[in-house]
């Protein structure tokens, strides 16, 4: 998560969750007051609404908000949701953040384009500004997409799917 997700006069810390659609590189981001399994489940449900479909696979690191960090017979809430929605939940190997390179790069971009330049006065203010930023960031052309924006690429992929 970006390093400067602090807001308010008390320096409250918030946590940015990020989902990237692999083919179009379109992103969905949302901030939470805690990094927990409940926030994770809520985020995945919000992302499904945002994208309009459930992904085939979700890849995460091994944080406790995504998976159990100790052996247990209990299922993690994210795994329960994924099972119910027929989503494969893949975790990267521990201590290998480069295996989540697209998300890590997007967090660096968020830091440079968003957190370094804006101040947030409350959690609500952060959410409002984050929504605006997400709209803008999904409209930035990317070299990997032949200088199309993620939104343009998604529209292109959807048009090809219905032909």
Q: What is the role of each PLM region?
A:
Residues 1-28:
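An active-site-proximal beta-strand-loop segment
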Residues 2, 19, 25, 44, ...:
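Mobile genetic element proteins and their domesticated derivatives, centered on retroelements
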Residues 7, 66-68, 99:
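Short, small-residue-enriched loops and turns at beta-alpha junctions
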Residues 31-32, 68-73:
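Short, solvent-exposed loop/turn segments at secondary-structure boundaries
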Residues 53-70, 93-95, 147-150:
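Acidic/histidine-rich, metal-coordinating catalytic segments
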Residues 61-62, 72-82, 89-112, 126, ...:
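RNase H-like two-metal-ion nuclease catalytic core shared by retroviral integrases
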Residues 85-87, 109-163:
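C-terminal domain-tail junction helix/linker
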């Amino acid at each position: 998560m970006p390093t400067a997700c602090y807001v308010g006069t008390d320096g409250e810390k918030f946590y940015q969750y990020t989902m990237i659609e692999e083919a179009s590189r379109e992103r969905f981001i949302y901030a939470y007051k805690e990094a927990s399994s409940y926030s994770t489940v809520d985020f995945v449900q919000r992302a499904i609404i945002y994208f309009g479909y459930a992904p085939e696979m979700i890849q995460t690191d091994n944080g406790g908000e995504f998976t159990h960090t100790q052996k247990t017979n209990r299922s993690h809430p994210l795994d329960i949701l994924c099972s119910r929605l027929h989503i494969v939940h893949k975790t990267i190997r521990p201590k290998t953040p480069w295996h989540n390179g697209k998300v890590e790069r997007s967090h660096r971009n968020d830091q440079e384009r968003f957190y370094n330049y804006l101040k947030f006065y409350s959690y609500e203010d952060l959410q409002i500004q984050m929504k605006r930023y997400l709209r803008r960031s999904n409209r930035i052309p990317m070299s990997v997409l032949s200088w199309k924006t993620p939104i343009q690429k998604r529209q292109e992929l959807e048009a090809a799917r219905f032909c």
